[in-house]
């Protein structure tokens, strides 16, 4: 179990039994080319997140890998979410049908859970497992190596909560920033990966611009794995490892 970590900087397996069909992008010749990535449907009996409006376009699909933070007032209380911390990796090219390195639909849907179950959280964790370093939580910026892929997944940025407690996505590799607010959320499908500690998957989210963003206006958190709290077994702070797919639009 990871102890809760709340970092302040100065300046958030799919039930894809039937994956959504691809949208084909017509080429200038009128012939279909690579499919346009389509947000996954929840398929778990819950209402869906709103679809992206027609006046925005997809900028990145990122894998977020880190921790969700909670606090408990006492053992009888419900855990209160108090932030998150994650490294973001650009997986747009891995979406099915995008190119020679693309994954199959099944591989894509299982990627967050597979990574969470097999790799170490890419943060500077304290030696005794009490969360991430308060001084330098993020390690050196580097791409993510996965045994099943011939090439590393490119680093894209960081996810954290700023000094005002606002969820922030700093895509510094692309020089883009989303200072976010929650517009909507739904429960993750029951079949979603529960994570290595079996806590369950955090909700899917739809996020918008809270002011101060540039290059990104909206984000979706989908295909979540792990990240739900351990419950209030004691008073204090707690953290749970998680992965998710973040779809960024502008």
Model-inferred region functions:
Residues 1-21:
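Fungal secretory targeting signals
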């Amino acid at each position: 179990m990871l102890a809760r970590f709340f970092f302040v900087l100065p300046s958030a397996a799919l039930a894809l039994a039937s994956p959504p069909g691809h949208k084909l992008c017509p080429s200038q010749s009128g012939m279909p080319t690579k499919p346009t990535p389509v947000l996954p449907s929840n398929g778990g009996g819950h209402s869906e997140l709103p679809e992206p409006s027609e006046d925005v376009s997809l900028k990145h699909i990122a894998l977020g890998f880190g921790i969700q933070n909670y606090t408990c007032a006492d053992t009888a209380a419900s855990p209160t979410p108090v932030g998150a911390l994650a490294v973001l990796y650009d997986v747009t090219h891995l979406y099915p049908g995008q190119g020679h390195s693309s994954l199959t639909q099944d591989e894509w849907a299982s990627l967050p859970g597979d990574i969470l179950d097999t790799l170490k959280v890419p943060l500077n964790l304290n030696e005794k497992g009490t969360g991430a370093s308060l001084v330098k939580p993020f390690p050196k910026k580097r791409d993510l190596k996965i045994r099943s892929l011939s090439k590393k997944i490119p680093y894209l940025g960081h996810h954290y909560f700023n000094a005002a407690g606002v969820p922030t996505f700093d895509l510094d590799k692309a020089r883009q920033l989303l200072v976010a607010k929650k517009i909507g959320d739904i429960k993750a499908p029951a079949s979603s990966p529960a994570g290595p500690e079996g806590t369950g998957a955090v909700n899917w989210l739809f996020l918008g611009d809270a002011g101060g963003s540039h290059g990104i206006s909206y984000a979706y958190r989908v295909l979540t794995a792990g990240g739900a709290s351990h419950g209030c077994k004691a008073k204090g702070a707690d953290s749970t490892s998680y992965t998710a797919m973040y779809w960024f639009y502008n």
